[in-house]
Structure formats: structure tokens, C-alpha cells
Amino acid sequence: MGIGTKILSKIEKNKTSDGLTIPLTPTTQKQSSSWCSFESIKTFFRTVIRDWIFLALLGFIMASLSFGMDYAILNLQNGQMRLFDLVKEYHFTLAYLVWVGYVVGLILLSAVCAHYIAPQAIGSGIPEMKTILRGVILKEYLSVRTLLSKMIGLTLSLGSGLPMGKEGPFVHVASVVASQLTRLVHGSSGGIFENESRSGEMLAAGCAVGVACTFSAPIGGVLFSIEVTSVYFAVRNYWRGFFAATCSATLFRILRMFSVSAAVTVEAHYQTNFPPQNVFLPQELPIFALIGLVCGLAGSIFVYLHRRTVLFLRRNWLAKMIFQKYWLIYPIFIATFISSLSFPLGLGKFMGGEERFSHTMKEFFVDCAWTAPPNDSYACPMPTSNATSSDSFDIRHWKGDNYDYSPFVTLSSFQVVYFFLAILASTLPVPSGIFMPVFVLGAAFGRLVGEGVFSLDPYGHISGDIQFFVRPGVYAVVGAAAFCGAVTHTVSVAVIVFELTGQLCHLLPVMIAVLIANAVASYLQPSIYDSIIRIKNLPYLPDIPHTTSLYHQMLIEQFMISPLVYIAKDSTVGDIKRALETKTRIRAFPLVENMESLALVGSVSRSQLQRYVDSQIGTKARFAEATRRIKQRLEDEESERKRREESKSDDTEDSLETTGAGERRASRFLIVPVAKNGPQVAKNETLTGLSEENARKILTVEEKQALFDAASLATPKREMSGKTINPVHIESHHTIGDIFRSITHLSFGRQNFPKKNNHNEFDLFGEERTEWEDMMLNQKLDLSQLDIDSTPFQLSEYTSLFKAHSLFSLLGLNRAYVTKKGQLIGVVALKELRLAIEYLQSGKVPTPGMSIFNEPPTEQSIYEKSARLESGRATGDAQNAAFVTDNGEDDAQNDYIQPPLEVVRRGALTPNRMSELTRLENVRTTPESPHFEVSSPSTSSSCVSIDFSPLDAANSENGSVGGLVLNVPSLPTRARSANELTRQNTHVQINLPDDVHDEKF
């Protein structure tokens, strides 16, 4: 290629869109190069901000919050112990009051904080985050207000020492922080829900960080958050969770390292010191499997009792009557009850003594035998005099000061009592988690089994190796992982245990026990998080058990909603309006080709249809039509006036009235005072004259500067007082009179807008408004003004329930339309899938080819108790068919202890509508356009408004038109009488308020 060809090629590349060429100078090339470099740097920096720096900042913030909360909790708990130590030697009753009062006070403060700042902070947070990641929006659940309430309330509740956890609430806290950071990065208008895909990625990372900064376990935190919040997880988001969790765990461990008392924080790193070899024998594996089996059964019982307790508090008539009016009684009573049972000088001495519930984990993991004799080599050593509670284990907490109690008694008492106390504590209206209590209970059970095995065979005689010791601490680790896995239905809890203990020598026993416990519990009960979702009636799709083939046999045609409401291409605006008004809870409407074929062509969201209807017959559309009509009428009047002027050019009958300043055209209206005893008008008192041209100008200003009232005229029957406005007999009256008659004939009225809308608009009233609305409602649908989803998800009527459940879970669907050869025959939403699953779980067998909604109810029917079942059957509305199950969804709105969360439907997020207009009842003046609004005292009467302006109003600096706005009281004969008054030059008397004086005109 020659040099000339290269130059021409470069010139062609640098041509602009206008056909011009840019000379190839060195300066231009340098600027282009620098510009490209700047854009590249900007793009790279934006990418770094949105991913790496964002995730690192999220991890660092959560680590700091976690460490700060642990420090505050430790000081609160130590404060209680110091107060108790001061008084326990003097008086038993005083010690009891101090112990109980301290706990009750903190719980009461936490409950008040959560109740009045943000009720969304109550509870764990993992169930709610599970629904949010599914696509549900919970009102104000990720707000700063909720974050503040959660942090304060959780610190107070954990500082009380009750059996509560921190892991679940911190998942919620991390999600809120992720949401707020997203708002800062992407702007306050967007937030976490601006992009649903983006929100899922960041919230998933936030959940992982919440677990990681609680246990300092980044790997287990990521895996656990995925298990409890996701059904299907996108692998591309894996690195986000690990990176943010690693940043959080790293900073958290560094902060603990520099903390003096870090070893005894509430959620500490429980380092164990088991030897790498000979931790367990193969002969012990059946015992570990048995621990998993028992923990699976106990975990199912725990979930069941928790659900029954919550439902009992909702349904019991006495609880309803008390807690509805005095909700503080419940937290006070439960806090008093739990703290009384744990009182160290009472029953508490058989459950660990003065050791706090959250601090017992390290004692359960200690590598010594509690039941060994004091002089045994494997016995737990006594603490030294200069040892602190952070680096020693005091066996006297579990055996008494004089070794009076057996560890079997104290461990058994601890498990039984705290098993029920943990359930009661989880029902309190305060921020609290459930992970840590079940973790401690599992460790206590494992320790009990380990001590029992040690008592029977302390030196491993079953193996023939006298050098081997049975280590109860290993059993405690296995029990903690197994029971926690059974309650939460997770396997990743084993990884958390490995990171908590810092050892992998007990990997095999832990995995065996966790898998068995998880399998047993999954067969008997849902996880604690799914149970809470059902209790709170949050919209979420339950899992399908793989133990029966009924889920493969039930077809969509047996639980779809049919017939359903749809929109056709030939539908009218009225059809759409009726559909929106009658089906207020449907979020999207299917669009079909026509009423006959019902061929599905797409779907339209409710918000789109609502905006379309508003644009056709809404307030703004009506105002625009009124403005068009008044302008058209005034233009016609102008043309008519010019025609008459041309035909009567020699007519000079118009007279001018001379004032002190000069001559002006006479006005048809006079403002004169009216005597108290009667409406006598003095015709020699005039305000000022308005020319015909100025009156026309005032009436043709933009609609935002003119305001008209309805012409439904009715004069109040009362004696007139104050001042009046009087018409004068002039020959030019026909022009202004014609305009007046035109306005009254059009029935334009004055309305009062909300304060945020200070503009004036024309409006239609009466028959004209009705005729216009009827005309608009009969118009055909204009598809060009709608954003149509042309590819809605469709399923065949023969799709199985199992396959539909998999598709909904994998793709994150909210609804799917059921078609037969392209013809729309029904719709299936998340609610129908959930009801079908619960139908099969209740033990019923569906009749082939028959809808489960049309089957006759039986005694065991889960639909029998629903008051809205018949409504759902009759209308076919998927949202109106709500059924009652044993989960207590019918009582979700009656929970006075833990207020229900409000679900925000995306279809309800429509633009703000104009509020209902109110009528003016008093006089107002504005400096921009000085005028007076005179209205009838009767609230039911309407007025006609005319704006008159002085001659020099058009010359004002800001171009605005000032003047006098007069609201003429209506007459019984309505607009026809107003026209008669104008044509006959009848004296019109308008009542003015007493504070209006002549100088204001």
C-alpha cells in the first residue's frame, strides 16, 4: 500500500458525521490519544469502584461494626456480673433483684428501640433476606432507620445474656450496609433495587459478610449464606462473596488481636487444642452417627415447638387481649422468667453458675474430662489465683465450689432448660438470632455424650490401646455442628466449625453427624428459616421433598387459575380501566390477539396500563382538553369580533369615562359598598374601566395563569352584605358577554390544587365532562404507547408440578402463563405453586383432570378455614385465593408481639397520582398575581371565575398577569340563568369578605 493510500485511509477515518474532515495534525492525534486514555482510566476506575473497592469497603465496615458491638456487649455483661458480685454477699433478695432487673431493663430498652424506631429490626433477618433475594421487596427493610434500630437493639438484647444469637441479625445488618453503599455509589435515586440482577449480587455478598464477620469464618460464611438464602446460586458471584468475606474476617481478627479481652467476646474464635493424631477411634464412628440421629430428631422438635409457640401467642384469646393493648408485658414477663431460672444462687447453679450462656461454648470444647478424678492426668486443672476468665476454665461452674454436683446433672439441666428458654427468647420482639443458641445446645449435648463415653471407657479399652483417651471435647464439637445443621438444614455449618476451632482433625466425625442430622430433620420439618417464612406469611416458594412421586404426577392444569382477566388488542380504554379497578392486586395482565382466538402475544404490567389510562382520561388529559376547548372558543370569538368590527367600522357608540388621570373605557362591572340593611347599589361609584381588548387578553393567557370554576350556579338565600360589583349598561357588552356566555356554556371551573402544585388549570364539569369521558373510554387500545413484554414465560398444561417448581426457582419467575397451542387458558403464580405443594403435603391425593380448587372440602382440608376461598374460586383471581394452613398464615396480621412485615408489590409502584382537589373556602392573595378569590359560603355550591386585569398589567416586568378573580355565586337555574343575567345586563351582586377594602382593588 502506497503512502498516498494510507493518507486517504486516515482521512476517511477522521471524517465527522457532517462530512467534514479533521486535519491530521500532531496536536489532534495527541488530544485523541489523551482522550482515549482518560476514558479508559475512567472506565477502569468505575469498574474498580463498583466491584473491588465496594466489596472491600463492605467487609471493613462490617468487621468494625461487629468488633464494636462485641466490645459493647462484653462491657454490658461484665457490668451485670460486677453489680451482682457487689450485692450477692449481703442479701439474697437484693442479689435477685439486681440480676433480674438488669436483664429486664436491657430487654425492655431493646424492645422499645425496635418498636418505635423500626419494627423491621425485630427477629433474625435471614428469612427475610431469603425472600428479598427471591425478588420480594419488603418495605423499609433495608433502610438506615432499620440499621440503626438493629444495631442498638441487638447490642442491648445480647448484653442481657439471654440465649440469643448474633449471626442472623448481622446478615441483615450487612445487607442494609450493602444497600446503602450501593445508593452512595450509584446515586440516591437508584439504590439496591434499581437493577434486580445487581441487587442480588450485592445482597448475596452482604449475607456472606454478615456470617464471616460474626464467626471470623470467611469460607464457611460464604457457603452458609448460599445455603440459607439461595435455591440456585450463580457461580459468577462466588468471588464477590469470598472477597468481601475475606476482607471482613481479616480485619475482624486483627482487631481481636489488639484487643485485651478479645478471647471472651460474645462470638469468639473458639480455638481447640486436640492432638493431630488419635482424636477418635473407628469404633467411635457409630456413636457420632447416633449423635447425628438424635440431633436430627431434637432439631425437628425444636422447629415444631417454636412454630407452635408463636401460633399459640397469636391465637390465644387471653394473649390477644393483653398484648394488643399492653405489648410491653410480654418482653417483661419473658425476661423475668428466663433471668429467674438462670439466677446463679437459685436454679442457675445447676446450669453453669455465673457463666454466661454465650461464654459456655469455649468450656464445652475444652480438651479435658469433667468427670475425671481431680488427680487424674486428663482431669481439668483448677484455675490459678492470677488467672483471668479469658485464659482459664473453672470446673466449679459445673461441679460446684466443693464438687457437690455431677456434670451429668448440670449438663442435663442446662440442655433441658435452655432448650425451651431459647424458644421463648426467639419470640421476643427484639433483634435476635437463632444460630448461636442451637450451636451451644448441640455442644452441651455432645459434651454430655462424651462425658458418658469417658466414664464408661476413659482410656479406650475397646481399641486395646491404653495410650488413647476418649476426648469429650470432640463430642461437643460434633454435637454443636449436628444440632445446628439439623435446625438450619445446612451442611456448611461443618465448615464453620472447622474455622471456629481451627482444626480439621475431627473432620470425619463432624461430617457424618451433620449429614445424618440434616437428612433426618429435612424429612420431618422445614428449616427454622423456612418455618419463620411460613409463620410470617412471606411470599416464598417452599422446597419439594423428594420422597414421593405425587409431585411428578400433579399437572399445572390441576392448580392453574382459569378463567383469568386479560387485555385484547381490540380492547377499549374502558375495558382496561374496569380491569384495573376490579383486579387491584394483579401485577401484570396477559395481552391476547383478540377475544375469540385468545392467542397470547405478550403481557403488560399494571403500572404501564395505569399510566396509559391516566394519559387518556386522567386529570392532566382532561385539563389539556379543557384548555384546547377554551382556546378554540376564544379564537372563534376573536374572529367573530373582527368580522363585526369590519361590518360596523363606522359605529362609534362606545363611550369613555374620564377619570383624574385620563380617559378609560367604561367597565361593565362596578364595585360599590352595600348597606347592612339591604343591597342598594350606587351606580356612580365605579372601580375602573376595562377595555374590550384587555378583557380578551386576560382570557387568552396560558392556562397556568387562568383558573375557572364550575358553572353549576346556585345563589345562597341570605341577606347580602359587604361590597358588590355592579355591571354597567354599555353597548360593548355583547363582546365580553359573548365570552362570558362561552365560558359558562363550557362549564369550566376553579379547583384548588395541593400546595406543591401552584399552577392553575382549566377543567371540564357536568355533562361535558361525562360526554368527553364516555368518548375517551370507547377509544381502542393504542399499543404503541405501551411497553409490552412480547416473550412472557409460557408453560404447557401438562407440565408437572416438580418441573414447574424447578423452572420458577431456577429462573426466578413470579408467574407463567399456561397455553394450549398458543391459546391462553390460565396462569400460574408463586402462590398457586405454594398451595399445590401444601395440598400434597397435607396428605391429599389430587383427582386426575380436576382442579384442586374445585374439590369438595373435607374435615382435613387445608382450605376449609379460608374465608377468601370462595372469592378466589368465583373470580379466578390468583391473588384472592388465600388458604389457611397449619403454619398460621391466617393469623400473620394478628401478631401484636412481632408486627408483620409489609410486602411492596412492584406492580403497585405507579407514579404519584394527583390528589383529590379541594374547594376554596377563604380569600387568598399572592404577590406574583394579586387577586381576590370570593367564594360562596355554601360548601356544596360551585362558582364561575373570571380574571380581569388593569390596563397596565401586560407591561409588568415579569410578564405575569395580575388582576381580580371573582367567583360568582351560583344560581338555582345553573348556566342558563347566568347567560340570561349577562344578556339582560342584570345587576350581579357578589358578597365580599369584610376585610376586603377598595384600595386592594
Swiss-Prot record:
Q: Quick one: a GO biological-process term for this protein?
A: chloride transport
Motif Selectivity filter part_1 — list its residue ranges.
123-127
Q: What is the effect of changing L833E?
A: Confers similar gating properties to isoform b; in isoform a
Q: What is the effect of changing E167C?
A: Increased sensitivity to MTSET-mediated inhibition; in isoform a and isoform b. Inhibition is slower; in isoform a. Reduced sensitivity to MTSET-mediated inhibition
UniProt note on tissues of expression: Expressed in excretory cell, 4 anterior epithelial cells of the intestine, hermaphrodite-specific neurons and enteric muscles. Expressed also in vulva and uterus. Isoform a is expressed in oocytes (at protein level).
Q: Name one Pfam family in it.
A: Voltage_CLC
Q: Which residues lie on this side of the membrane: Cytoplasmic?
A: 1-48, 525-1001
Q: Where is the composition biased (Basic and acidic residues)?
A: 634-650
Effect in UniProt of substituting E167A: Constitutive activation and loss of pH sensitivity; in isoform a
Q: Which Gene3D superfamilies match?
A: CBS-domain, Clc chloride channel
Query: Phenotype upon knockout?
Result: RNAi-mediated knockdown in oocytes results in inhibition of hyperpolarization-induced or swelling-induced current and in premature ovulatory contractions of gonadal sheath cells. Normal adaptive response to hypotonic swelling.
Q: Where is this motif: Selectivity filter part_2?
A: 165-169
A single MF term (Gene Ontology): voltage-gated chloride channel activity
Intramembrane-annotated stretches: 126-133, 202-214, 218-226, 473-487, 488-489, 490-501, 502-506
The primary location reported for this protein is membrane
Q: Where in the cell?
A: Cell membrane
Instruction: Report what the Swiss-Prot or TrEMBL entry states about this protein's PTMs.
Output: Phosphorylated by gck-3; phosphorylation at both Ser-742 and Ser-747 is required to inhibit channel activity. Dephosphorylated by gsp-1/2 during cell swelling and oocyte meiotic maturation, which results in channel activation.
Instruction: Report the residue ranges where the short sequence motif Selectivity filter part_3 is annotated in this entry.
Output: 433-437
* Annotated phenotype, changing S742A: Constitutively active, loss of inhibition by gck-3-mediated phosphorylation
- Domain comment in the entry: The CBS domains, the R-helix linker (543-562) and the C-terminal domain (833-1001) regulate channel sensitivity to voltage, pH and extracellular chloride concentrations, probably by altering the outer pore structure. The region (738-751) between the CBS domains is essential for channel activation.
Q: What is this protein called?
A: Chloride channel protein clh-3
Coding gene?
clh-3
